[in-house]
């Protein structure tokens, strides 16, 4: 765990120019440090308790918006709108899934983490991050079901997949991931 943590901290310094969601180039490596400082405990807590603490998500959202303001009003507006839409979309999906399945399918912490990601990544970034999260979560869920480690309708933490998506898109930018999806589909 310590080696993974160290690698994540070091990777914050290797962010590509396209990865910072419109932030000034000089700010990119330093902005990644508080982002990983927020994502790492959120992942560990969700893995242990199936819970994403709202105060961490809230502070992450505020810090993401403050840093976005350093890039100017257009970037701040994009990130603010992305945060609001991510929250509303995830809460809507959660409510719809609960109605259809008769049990909760997503925790509201997942919606708050997605909103935090929108504050850091903007609309294009959180869309790519959530696509990665859904893909990774589906792969994990399928593998766990096939191996018998996950029972039907058994809950598993989705926050780590959202955090993974946010971090990967932070490092490379959303365009690179969309290009990889298109390449994978043969387009």
Put a short name on every predicted segment.
Residues 1-9, 57-64, 111-113, 158-163:
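Core segments of transmembrane alpha-helices
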């Amino acid at each position: 765990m310590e080696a993974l943590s160290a690698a994540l901290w070091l990777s914050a310094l290797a962010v590509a120019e396209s990865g910072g969601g419109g932030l000034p180039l000089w700010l990119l490596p330093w902005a990644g440090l508080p982002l990983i400082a927020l994502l790492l405990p959120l992942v560990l807590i969700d893995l242990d308790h199936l819970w994403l603490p709202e105060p961490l998500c809230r502070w992450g959202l505020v810090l993401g918006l403050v840093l976005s303001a350093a890039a100017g009003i257009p970037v701040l507006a994009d990130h603010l709108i992305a945060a609001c839409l991510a929250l509303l979309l995830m809460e809507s999906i959660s409510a719809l899934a609960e109605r259809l399945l008769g049990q909760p399918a997503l925790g509201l912490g997942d919606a708050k983490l997605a909103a935090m990601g929108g504050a850091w990544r903007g609309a294009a970034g959180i869309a790519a991050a959530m696509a990665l999260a859904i893909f990774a979560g589906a792969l994990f869920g399928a593998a766990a079901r096939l191996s018998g480690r996950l029972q039907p309708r058994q809950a598993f933490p989705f926050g780590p997949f959202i955090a993974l998506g946010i971090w990967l898109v932070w490092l490379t930018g959303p365009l690179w991931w969309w290009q990889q999806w298109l390449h994978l589909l043969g387009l």
